[in-house]
Amino acid sequence: MPTLAAILHTLDPFIVQFTPSFGLRWYGLLYASGLLCAWMIMRAVARRGRAGLTQRQVDDFITEVVIGVVVGARLGHALIYDRVLFTTFTPSFPFWELLAVHKGGLSSHGGMAGLLVVCWRFARRSGASFRTLLDLCCISAPPGLCLGRMANWINGELWGRPLPQDLQANAPWWCVKYPREVFEPSFDPSRLEPLRPLVHAGDDLQQAVVAAAYAGDAKVQAALEPLLTAFWPSNFFQAFTDGPVLAVVVWIVWLRRPAPGVATASFLVAYGLLRFITEQFREPDAGVNTLLGLTSPMLISVSMVVCGVVMAGRCRAAYRTVRDGSTGGS
């Protein structure tokens, strides 16, 4: 019985390309779309009087959120996954690799840390409730998190783990294969020799095969696909859990009008648990530290769950104290 082919990643990260390394990318467009969604949600909540901010204040707040998220996400990526970015300089713009955000490399954990700083600063300056601002951000974040994972997919980054060996020979239709695997040290380039007649290859057969595959050459794609490893579609898993699933959890909590900060606590617990689960299917980045078999993202996710549980308890206790005090004084 014939089976559907695996998902072969041949997406172009550029929408419009001006030079080999510069152009309008899907990565940036999707991140901008996520922030636009957050702004629209915040304004809608403000119109209903539950944001703790006016609509004009929301406009000021989202501007700072954009800066905080991008800076935090980039620094988080460099600290957790790729510290060499701090010391790498190039002759081309933007000269310092840490600033080369257009190439990808934004950490969701880092973005959340940046968001925390923004909420704290804005609350102190405006007099708004810090916990209410956090809640506002948490109910607005899932669309951006989902789109961020799809941006990772289009960029061909953050691969999943290889499927078990017994599934490699007859890989299921939902698995993902990456032509760029031929550049990995573990891939034997001699396996590509049967494809040489299909491409215009000089000395660099690997580059020619990958270029043809991404250019849409069906014959090259068909010949290359069986040679590639089948990976878990971790980008899709995390897009689903970080987006629709997380949104449902946080919005159910928020719509019940809990104490300020409880929606944030539910976000921390839900995101931490979901991220920990989906990280089991994601290939750890090279150089990422591990402790007791857990990668840095897993450890951070566990910390988020613990912080969420503690925060929920403290928020409810503080809310009861205020409520009882108000009742007693009436």
What are these model-derived regions, one by one?
Residues 1-330:
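A feature for loop-to-transmembrane-helix boundaries and adjacent hydrophobic helices
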